[in-house]
Amino acid sequence: MRGKLTLQQRLILPIVLLGLVALLSNILAVFSINNVHANAGTIVDEYMVSEGKLEEIRRSMMDIHRLALSHIVAEDHATMIRLVQEIKAEEAGLDEKLAGYESFAAGTDLETYQSLLRDYEAFKHALVYLVCASADSKTQDAYAMANGDVALWSEAAEADIDALYASVSRQAEAARGRLSIVYITSLVISAVTLVIGVLL
């Protein structure tokens, strides 16, 4: 009886061990999948969205600048009024985009974001002087303003956007590196548990 019990135990032991390995393998697989998913989600939800928002901000700045330059060469007051309305609408949209981007700015990026807001405000003030000179038929003054303060603050805001974009790209690259490490770790863990399962 005693020998028979030992034989049963010997037969059951590999099955129990295989069950434990399978359970451990499944737990580790779920953990690894969650890690990969979390890292991939961060890349998509945070960094790629942030880059997209920065491109929208850049495009809006360029559109406002283009509309202001169009105001200088406008031939009649109706066109000038329409362009001013378009500038105001674009500025309102850009104000919203900039406010929406605040949640993406953290750490050192927050300082660059604040600089972008200051440069954008200065850009808007310079546009007011440009449009006033243009509306008053002071074309030379308007061109001087376009090549002076408007260009200066537009370039400063563009530099801020470039700095934010570069920072986000670096963070996304670091997250991709972490994702690769998590993925490779997951593969190694799966391979080890598979080998252990086969050996049992």
Named regions from a protein language model:
Residues 11-64, 77-84, 103-120, 154, ...:
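Amphipathic alpha-helical segments and their boundaries
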Residues 1-4:
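Short, Lys/Arg-rich, polar N-terminal cytosolic tail immediately upstream
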Residues 14, 189, 193-200:
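Cytosolic-side ends of inner-membrane transmembrane helices, especially those
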Residues 30-47, 65-69, 98, 108, ...:
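Juxtamembrane amphipathic/coiled-coil helical coupling segments that flank
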Residues 85-100, 156:
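Amphipathic alpha-helical packing segments from all-alpha helical-bundle domains
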